[in-house]
Amino acid sequence: TMQRRQFLQTSALATALLGGMPLSATAKSAKGKVVVIGGGYGGATAAKYLRMLSGNQLDVTLVEPNSTFVSCPMSNLVVGGIRKINEISTPYTGLTRNHGVKMVKDYVTAIDVEKRTVKLKNGKTLPYDKLVLSPGIDLQLDKIEGLAAANASGQILQAWKAGPETVGLRKQLEAMPDGGTYILNVPLAPYRCPPGPYERASMVANYFKQY
């Protein structure tokens, strides 16, 4: 099952970060500091299970610029009108309240591997014993002339990262006149979530069929 695979993956990660020591030995030793960069599926899951599998002995800090996790694989359901954005969103406060993960809402701008510190956009630094990198993707909007400006103005929305643009894209669909043309561009491979564009095209076609 997905839960079992997820548990095995995070168990392996925890074992690596704990230096291969048994959890019973780790629980008696001084706390180690782990900084996790990125609060997507990988980063949030790693932060949660590092706390759990260390008996809450590890000091885990998650650096993520957003205050809420939005499920990207479910976002096309929002575009298609089957779900609302709040139904696929989860605040990160649950990681702090339920698992003791420290949250830092910011971006990482530099990593000093010798000093074992990460520098934040606000100028502060965080020390670490172990570092987990899970920042996700970035968008190469400059690859198509004019796309960056059109995206910044809200004229062309990609919604490749689920969130405000997902809602914006849905609103654009609702505002389209009858007989209007919808254009969807599929990025050159390799790209994140290969089925994504085809799922979106299907959801949009279903919306047009109904309305």
Which positions does each model-derived feature cover?
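Short, well-ordered coil/turn residues at beta-beta hairpins
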Residues: 10, 134-135
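Beta1-alpha1 glycine-rich phosphate/pyrophosphate-binding loop at the start
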Residues: 28-102, 151, 188-211
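A conserved short coil-to-beta-strand element within the FAD-binding core of flavoproteins
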Residues: 106-114
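Core beta-strand elements of the Rossmann-like FAD/NAD(P) dinucleotide-binding domain
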Residues: 122-130
